[in-house]
Amino acid sequence: FDAFIGYHHTLQSTAQKGLCMISGNEELIVKNHPCGIVAKDGRAKLISANDKSNFTYRGRFIEPQQALTVGHETSQKAHNALAWIIANQSIMIGGRTFVCWNPKGDTSLFKDSETLTPNYSDEEEKKDFPATPTDYKADLKKALSGWQDKLPAEDDIVIASFDAATTGRLSITYYNELKGSDFLNRLAFWKEHCYWSSGKFGYQSPSIWEIVKCAFGTEQNGKLSVDDRVMREQAQRLLHSVIDQAPIPQDI
């Protein structure tokens, strides 16, 4: 790898360089950036410039580089890191990709956060489930204590969602950065105030897609189903309620 990197730098040594607006360094500036960050949207790009027709930005910029310049090395590092995170730690809700990660390397935070309080299935052996709200909150407190041991309070947490409105453009539809302590406190606040009786499985906090199904779903063959377009938009609204402690939308 080191030999290839050295060879690549040699090829770039004679190329014209400019200021990378992300790293702040002088780098070889690239116009074309990687696609396929989200596998299902294989042709969609996060960074692209195409103004050969309709002239959306003419009169503001003459060249794409006047709006943004990104270095080749920075672009490769950022896109490949993001592609790995999405491939390994994302969940898909209604066709939209949601991902949560710790820049220090803790894995699968988003998936685990959905089970901060255990959810039980019919296949599991019969056990003692939280039979009352008091039992439920006691279980939640134990789970939160375990999470606090895993995730230092000062660690950073990043939550984002991605969706492609067209085949060529990938959008960041939600983005938030917060400390580990805030992240856990907000999850705990949501689960402490938003729970219901699950019959023989006791009291549990429903997932955001379960809430969307109950609010907007139509019954088909004994099951609730929701159009993907409705699911992804409403799930993101509820994610805002969970992570940002915003009020639950009145229509839900």
Positions of predicted regions on the chain:
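Short Cys/His-rich metal-coordination motifs, predominantly Zn2+-binding knuckles/fingers
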Residues: 23
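Short metal-coordination and nucleic-acid-contact micro-motifs, chiefly zinc-binding Cys/His arrays
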Residues: 12-18
